């Protein structure tokens, strides 16, 4: 999926440059998956929260050359490795009742639009696909620190978004587990 989007970006860049207009200059950043993570939380019995993490399998952030503001973000999560540090609950969350990781081992986010909301803040709108269902979602995003690490540059993106699990077919235990799931995303991108 990421390869198709990257090819699409390259094709669009080539076509744009072929018109005699200035060519687009993009910088492609890739997530350092060992330093990137998605945390999730949902209310439980109306008085507590269940928290967990879903590993980022890969993520790509595309910016204009020399800029850090994203204009394209793609993220693939490994739902089969979701963890809440409770083996029984993790097995339940990976089951057909919730994420159905056996049939849908990945969760995909593809951005559609990025709107600047401040000097280092953005709203990233896109499509979240899980359990075979694609729905719109938006993330409040901010750019963290930029640092140089040898010959590589690293930038930190932090984002928060919410979705209703029932919209993805996760209706089990609705009176016990809340419907609104909060995702807190940290991507350390490298170029």
Task: Describe the residue ranges of each PLM region.
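Bacterial N-terminal signal peptides that target proteins for export
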Residues: 1-10
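Cleavable N-terminal signal peptides
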Residues: 9-15, 23
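Low-complexity, acidic/polar, glycine-enriched regions of mature
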Residues: 21-191
